[in-house]
């Protein structure tokens, strides 16, 4: 995968997880719900008589991530606190032999922070 593809996949995953967390969806059912946003949005609409779209889910995730980021900054956390331990970057993971490629400042920039 290219860097742009990794960033896009990571961001999409984080947005869905943040939305699911905000809605209180059970972590054990997320193998189903996190891959089927349309299903979740339709269930919310059916239960509450709303007319939400999948864009709502994406925007909820964006807002949640932004609030979490700001909360952490207000609490005094910095990019240094977001950094993985050094061995993630130096010790290859079997069986692929890959190591982490991105550091906190790069990740946060990709999220728009």
What are these model-derived regions, one by one?
Residues 1-113:
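Extended C-terminal regions of large enzymes
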């Amino acid at each position: 995968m290219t860097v742009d593809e990794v960033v896009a996949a990571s961001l999409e995953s984080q947005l869905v997880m943040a939305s699911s967390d905000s809605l209180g969806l059970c972590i054990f059912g997320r193998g189903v719900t996190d891959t089927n946003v349309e299903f979740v949005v339709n269930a919310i609409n059916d239960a509450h008589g709303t007319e939400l779209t999948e864009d709502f889910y994406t925007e909820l995730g964006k807002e949640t991530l932004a609030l979490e980021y700001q909360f952490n900054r207000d609490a005094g956390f910095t990019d240094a606190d977001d950094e993985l331990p050094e061995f993630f970057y130096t010790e290859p993971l079997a069986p692929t032999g890959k190591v982490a490629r991105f550091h906190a400042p790069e990740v946060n920039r990709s999220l728009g922070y």
